[in-house]
Regions:
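N-terminal Rossmann NAD(P)H-binding glycine-rich loop of SDR-like oxidoreductase domains
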Residues: 3-25
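NAD(P)H-binding glycine-rich loop region in Rossmannoid oxidoreductase-like domains
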Residues: 29-111, 118
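Glycine/proline-rich active-site loop of Rossmann-fold NAD(P)-dependent oxidoreductases
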Residues: 156, 182-191, 199-200, 227-238, ...
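Conserved beta-loop-beta element that borders a ligand/cofactor-binding pocket
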Residues: 160-184
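Conserved C-terminal active-site "lid" loop/helix of NAD(P)H-dependent oxidoreductases
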Residues: 273-300
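Amphipathic terminal alpha-helices
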Residues: 304-320
């Protein structure tokens, strides 16, 4: 297959490109820079330089492909245009920075997925989009049949935008990723949590720390995207979860041991002071099952687990 991948030089997208190439597929990828284009070309993929707002480019690239994997994501200010930044801070004055960011993210994602879907319309070809486990129903082990909680920020807009094309002849599915997609080179949640503990001299958890986090290795996630592309069902929501529920206290305790700082309980009200923007996520109890995903696609996570990966990569000098 000829597969078009957005976010092709990102943390997850670059692993997806490598997985597809190793499986014998041809790949073209969207990247935002000339340096990214050079990286893709060295990997053996064709490169397009552009952004998610360039809908004509997305539509044309999708139409020329046999299928699309959408992993591109706006992670922060560095990923935003000047216009987006102005809108973000203007919106922050009317409802908060998180709400403003999520509105911009939803509009950008929905528009980009709409362009990709229109390029695949009436073809029966696959469109696989990245979504998230966060904010599925709390306090239970969420399954692939569950929908996101509607009154909090989540990635459900990506799923809705893709599934709108099912009735228009597109085999759309979603891969819901664990909040912790780990591996060598990770710059996501866990490195920020380690950095906060190193900076503040303490490794906290919320309350009793029994709330559960999911995790998946980057390479296992990449394999799941490939399988969803090749075999995925229209409307399916696959769970990119290698470990279904790790008590956050265990994560905090490992960090405390490796940094030689105390692990302590703090109330929710102090989470933002220590963790910054991640404060609202730390106390979530969001375990999730991958049973249906494994049975349906034959996906078997094979890489090392979160704690082994943390020991190997997350406490060296480069992680400071």
């Amino acid at each position: 297959m000829h597969v078009f991948v957005t976010g092709a030089t990102g943390w997850i997208g670059s692993a997806v490109v490598e997985e597809l190439l190793s499986a014998g597929h041809n790949v073209s990828g969207l990247t935002t820079s000339a340096a990214g284009a050079q990286k893709l070309q060295k990997m053996g993929a064709k490169a397009y330089v552009g952004k998610l707002g360039q809908h004509d480019l997305l539509r044309k690239s999708a139409a020329e492909s046999d299928g699309v994997i959408h992993t591109a994501f706006i992670h922060g200010l560095s990923s935003m245009s000047l216009g987006m930044r102005v809108r973000l801070f203007a919106g922050a004055l009317n409802g908060g920075i998180v709400s403003s960011f999520m509105r911009i993210l939803a509009e950008t994602e929905s528009g980009a997925i709409g362009a990709l879907g229109s390029g695949l319309e009436n073809s029966g070809r696959p469109l696989v989009v990245a979504s998230g486990i966060l904010y599925l129903p709390q306090g239970k082990v969420a399954t692939e049949k569950d929908s996101h909680v509607s009154n909090v920020p989540n990635r459900s807009f990506s799923e809705r935008a893709a599934f709108n094309f099912i009735q228009r002849g597109v085999r759309a599915s979603a891969v819901r990723l664990a909040p912790t997609v780990h591996g060598d080179g990770d710059h996501g949640f866990i490195p920020h949590i380690v950095q906060a503990a190193r900076k503040n001299g303490v490794s906290p958890y919320i309350g009793d720390g029994a709330n559960r986090w999911t995790a998946v290795h980057r390479l296992d996630a990449a394999k799941l995207f490939r399988l969803a592309l090749e075999k995925g069902e229209a409307g399916a929501k696959y769970h990119g979860v290698g470990e279904a529920g790790i008590p956050f206290q265990d994560i905090a305790s490992l960090i405390a041991t490796r940094l030689n700082v105390p692990a302590v309980s703090i109330p929710t009200s102090k989470a933002a002071k220590h963790f910054g923007m991640l404060g609202g996520f730390i106390g979530l109890d969001n375990p999730a099952s991958n049973e249906w995903t494994r049975q349906t696609l034959g996906w078997n996570p094979e890489q090392r687990g979160l704690f082994a990966d943390m020991d190997a990569h997350y406490f060296n000098s480069a992680a400071k």
